[in-house]
Amino acid sequence: MMAEPWQALQLLLAILLTLMALPYQARKKTFLSVHEVMAVENYAKDSLQWITDQYNKESDDKYHFRIFRVLKVQRQVTDHLEYHLNVEMQWTTCQKPETTNCVPQERELHKQVNCFFSVFAVPWFEQYKILNKSCSSD
């Protein structure tokens, strides 16, 4: 006879916890803010370096690309950071894997791409993921 009140109490508690969790799940996906930020801001700077490294890893080009102009950086805050990055990248004189003293290629070897990246970022754990990438050549 005593088991029935405890079972009813456990069921009531489970329902209550479920009802409390639902608004949290809905709220978790809400944007807290979207702002344009400076490229020199720590986490934006880390994200820019990370996309440069990723772009070069995925590229079949023999020369390294480097960001030469940051056109726009937006930071979106939810339960993580998301950066929307518009950049101008150019081929450098450095062939892979060399990365020091790299300057832009000139004349016939000049190659430039304009790219937009959306990056999922949890920089305090050094976790990044490209959500969207779109690049076009000059």
Swiss-Prot record:
Molecular function in Gene Ontology: cysteine-type endopeptidase inhibitor activity
Main location: secreted
Cross-referenced InterPro entries: CST11, Cystatin_dom, Cystatin_sf
Cystine pairings recorded for this chain: 94-102, 115-135
Subcellular location per the Swiss-Prot or TrEMBL entry: Secreted
Tissue: Detected in the epithelium and lumen of the epididymis, and in sperm (at protein level).
GO biological process: one example: defense response to Gram-negative bacterium
Pfam families: Cystatin
Keywords (A to Z) from UniProt: Antibiotic, Antimicrobial, Disulfide bond, Glycoprotein, Protease inhibitor, Secreted, Signal, Thiol protease inhibitor
PANTHER family linked to this entry: CYSTATIN-11
Membership in a protein family: Belongs to the cystatin family.
Function description: Has antibacterial activity against the Gram-negative bacteria E.coli. May play a role in sperm maturation and fertilization.
Record protein name field: Cystatin-11
Organism of derivation: Homo sapiens
